[in-house]
UniProtKB/Swiss-Prot annotation:
<feature type="domain" description="MPN">
    <location>
        <begin position="102"/>
        <end position="224"/>
    </location>
</feature>
<dbReference type="Pfam" id="PF04002">
    <property type="entry name" value="RadC"/>
</dbReference>
<dbReference type="InterPro" id="IPR001405">
    <property type="entry name" value="UPF0758"/>
</dbReference>
<keyword id="KW-0482">Metalloprotease</keyword>
<protein>
    <recommendedName>
        <fullName>UPF0758 protein Sama_0327</fullName>
    </recommendedName>
</protein>
<dbReference type="InterPro" id="IPR025657">
    <property type="entry name" value="RadC_JAB"/>
</dbReference>
<keyword id="KW-0479">Metal-binding</keyword>
<dbReference type="GO" id="GO:0008237">
    <property type="term" value="F:metallopeptidase activity"/>
</dbReference>
<dbReference type="GO" id="GO:0006508">
    <property type="term" value="P:proteolysis"/>
</dbReference>
<dbReference type="InterPro" id="IPR020891">
    <property type="entry name" value="UPF0758_CS"/>
</dbReference>
<feature type="binding site">
    <location>
        <position position="186"/>
    </location>
    <ligand>
        <name>Zn(2+)</name>
    </ligand>
</feature>
<keyword id="KW-0645">Protease</keyword>
<comment type="similarity">
    <text>Belongs to the UPF0758 family.</text>
</comment>
<dbReference type="InterPro" id="IPR010994">
    <property type="entry name" value="RuvA_2-like"/>
</dbReference>
<feature type="binding site">
    <location>
        <position position="175"/>
    </location>
    <ligand>
        <name>Zn(2+)</name>
    </ligand>
</feature>
<dbReference type="Pfam" id="PF20582">
    <property type="entry name" value="UPF0758_N"/>
</dbReference>
<dbReference type="GO" id="GO:0046872">
    <property type="term" value="F:metal ion binding"/>
</dbReference>
Length: 225
């Protein structure tokens, strides 16, 4: 049944306007973003199918274009709508660590990195640049793709740190497998970066590896030293 044929006030947009977004289900909120359905499905039914197909909102919003567009009736426009919404949500979360914000606890950093990096279908290597008071200067994605000792160039990090005049950094990356346990390659990369930063008197405070349910801190394991 088309949403326009539903009882008055039961459509997701009308319900949102009358009762507030908190009263909508995940599928109803997603339907508002999608705006319309596809042949044979209204927007709410389509939203339910998408959430079920991908196993939740996080994997859906981090899915690739190919993964989304392989579903019948979906194309680049729907994918663009999902990506725009996900990026807005990331930027909103990022406001908690805007320039000048102080990292008061590891949990704050974990929450931010979890939202930025968890459930991505590809690896992202990034850095949090901090001043001498551990206030945030900037969060920068250095590159995307398979991360190994050959693909991480210490000179690029050093150049960025000098450009932004950072006094300390936290590096981080995700494991698309969902398992956060660091590899030996991760430990070797960390040692190389720490040594490179030491040549310009900048501290590597931590390397955090983001998985689906856990974020491993090198500092907490005593691996930074």
């Amino acid at each position: 049944m088309a949403i326009r044929d539903w009882p008055e006030g039961e459509g997701p947009r009308e319900k949102l306007l009358q009762r507030g977004a908190a009263h909508l289900s995940d599928a109803e909120l997603l339907a508002v973003l999608l705006r319309n359905g596809v042949s044979g499905q209204n927007a709410v039914d389509l939203a339910r199918e998408l959430i079920g197909e991908f196993g939740g909102l996080r994997p859906l919003f981090s899915a690739t274009k190919q993964q989304v567009c392989r579903l019948q009736g979906l194309g680049p426009v729907k994918y663009a709508q999902l990506q725009a919404s996900a990026e807005l949500a990331r930027r909103l979360a990022g406001e908690s660590l805007q320039r000048g914000a102080v990292l008061t606890s590891p949990d704050l950093t974990r929450d931010y990195l979890r939202f930025q990096l968890a459930d991505r279908a590809y690896e992202v290597f990034a850095v949090l640049l901090l001043d001498s008071q551990h206030r945030v200067i900037q969060f920068v994605e250095l590159f995307r793709g398979t991360i190994d000792a050959a693909s991480v160039y210490p000179r690029e990090l050093v150049s960025l740190v000098l450009e932004k005049r950072a006094a300390a950094v936290i590096v981080c990356h995700n494991h698309p497998s969902g398992v956060a346990e660091p590899s030996q390659a991760d430990r070797r990369i960390t040692e190389r970066l720490k040594n490179a930063l030491a040549t310009i008197d900048v501290s590597l405070l931590d390397h955090m590896v983001v998985g689906d349910r856990e974020i491993v801190s090198f500092a907490e394991r005593g691996w930074i030293g």
